[in-house]
Design a protein with these regions (language model features):
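Short, motif-level signal for alpha-helix interfacial/capping segments enriched in acidic residues
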Residues: 22-33, 79-80, 139-148, 152, ...
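Cytoplasmic juxtamembrane regions at transmembrane-helix boundaries
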Residues: 62-85, 177-199
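Interfacial/capping segments of alpha-helical transmembrane domains
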Residues: 10-26, 128-141
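A structural feature that tracks compact, well-ordered secondary-structure segments
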Residues: 5, 12, 32-65, 70, ...
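Alpha-helical transmembrane segments and their helix-start/interface "positive-inside/aromatic belt" motifs
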Residues: 1-2, 55, 99-117
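Cytosolic juxtamembrane amphipathic/interface segments immediately preceding
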Residues: 88-102
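Histidine (H) residue identity feature
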Residues: 35-38, 88, 107, 124, ...
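Charged/polar interaction segments and conserved charged motifs
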Residues: 1-16, 23, 89, 116
Length: 199
C-alpha cells in the first residue's frame, strides 16, 4: 500500500508539473504538491469509494443471500456470526460490559467503515474544490464556494465513476464464485463443490 501511494504521489507530482509547465506556470515542490488539490482529490476520491464498498458489503451480507456464492451466508441455517454474543473470559471488553457498549460494538465494523467513508468523502470534496479553484485562479476566472461546488457535476462525476467500479468488482466476485474456483483461496468454494451449493 505504501509503495503504491508513494508511486501515485511521485507520478502525480510529475504529471501536475508537466501540465503547469505547459500552461507557463511555476512547478510545485514536493512539499507544495502534498497540499495541492490535485493530490488530495485523487487520493481521497479512491479511498472514499473503497470505504463505501466495504461498508455496504458488510451491511448487505448481513441479510442478503446468493445461492451458490462463496461470499454468501447459508440460505437455510444459522451461522456463528448470527448468534448473540456470550460474555466469557477472553471476550472483547464491550461484550463483557454489555449495555450500550455492546450495542455499538455489534455494529462497530460497519460504523468504522461509515466514518472512514465520511472522512474520505469530505477530504475528496475539499481536494476537488481546491483543485477546481486553483485552475480557475490560473485562468483568471471566478472561484466557487463549497456550497456552490457541492452541486457541481465535476465533483459527482469523480465520485460516481469510482463507486460504480467498486460495485462492479463486488458483484463480479459474488456471481463468478458460484461457478468458478480458486484452490486454496478462502474467497472460493471447494473445487469439487456443486455450483448450486452455498458453503
Amino acid at each position: 500500500m505504501i509503495s503504491c501511494l508513494a508511486a501515485q504521489f511521485f507520478t502525480g507530482w510529475k504529471t501536475e508539473n508537466k501540465e503547469l509547465a505547459e500552461n507557463g506556470e511555476a512547478a510545485l515542490s514536493i512539499g507544495q504538491y502534498v497540499h495541492s488539490g490535485h493530490f488530495i482529490q485523487a487520493t481521497f476520491e479512491n479511498w472514499e469509494s473503497e470505504f463505501l464498498q466495504m461498508m455496504l458489503y458488510v451491511l448487505l451480507t448481513v441479510s442478503l443471500r446468493q445461492k451458490g456464492s462463496s461470499e454468501s451466508k447459508s440460505l437455510d441455517k444459522e451461522e456463528d456470526v448470527d448468534k448473540e454474543p456470550v460474555p466469557h473470559a477472553d471476550a472483547p471488553w464491550p461484550v463483557k460490559k454489555g449495555g450500550i457498549w455492546l450495542k455499538i460494538y455489534k455494529h462497530s465494523l460497519s460504523l468504522a467503515f461509515a466514518l472512514l467513508f465520511l472522512i474520505s468523502f469530505s477530504m475528496h470534496f475539499y481536494g476537488s474544490l481546491k483543485e477546481y479553484n486553483e485552475e480557475q485562479i490560473s485562468k483568471e476566472k471566478p472561484t466557487m464556494s463549497a456550497s456552490q461546488y457541492i452541486t457541481e457535476s465535476r465533483f459527482w462525476f469523480e465520485s460516481f465513476q469510482n463507486w460504480q467500479s467498486e460495485f462492479l468488482a463486488v458483484a463480479s466476485l459474488v456471481i463468478l464464485s458460484i461457478w468458478l474456483r480458486e484452490k486454496g483461496s478462502p474467497e472460493s468454494k471447494p473445487v469439487d463443490m456443486p455450483h448450486h451449493e452455498t458453503p
